[in-house]
Amino acid sequence: MKTTDTLRIGENVYEYEWRRKPIKTLNLRVRPDGSLYVSSPPFVSKKEVERFLQERRLFIEKASMRGLTLADGTSVHIFGKEMPLFIEPATRRHHACITENGVYLYVYEKDNRDERVNLYRNLLKETAEHVFPQVLARLYPVAAPYGVPYPQMKLRRMRSRWGSCMPTKSLITLNTYLVIAPLSCTDQVVLHELCHFLEPNHSVRFYAYLSRMMPEWRRWREALKEYTPYCL
């Protein structure tokens, strides 16, 4: 079920979309256009959703101000580092690259935001394809003593989660948007998914395993929230 409505939060009025899903917690995303997307368990009421939004006022206001425009002269984040963004005309084919000086998007039409967004997303995917297998190889020895098999890895652009897994297929899936966050955030997500090979639910035993593998996991899980506004 989908509900669309508006809500005054502080001095601003926000449009929000609310969907009930088979999940256990309320989730919030601030879209690039400033609207809000909320997903909730089936039993949650509209009153509870709006109270949840009011409680997240500071996050919403901060995220709304930081929305990513991908305009020339603005900035993007790569592995947690803020880097200047340059929009340049493409001479042959449009493409994107990361240099020491910043991130470059070579475009056919400078005012075409869709082209910039697609190039940016492709850049994150290509970077993830290069870096994340190395992250898994580095972290696997931490999980191996617990009997976790070496998994296959898939990469996807996802809206509602940073990672997922299918232990029966020995598979983990990582969100390509993790490229924008510090590598320690990706470490936390990878180890989180590997712990699900040992415990399918978020039980006490699950978090005990995760705490052994990465004692500071809470810090990096919390840090990931800062990068949600940059997920286009």
Located regions from the model:
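Walker B catalytic acidic pair
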Residues: E193
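Active-site-proximal or metal-binding-adjacent scaffold patches in catalytic folds
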Residues: M1-Q188, F197-L232
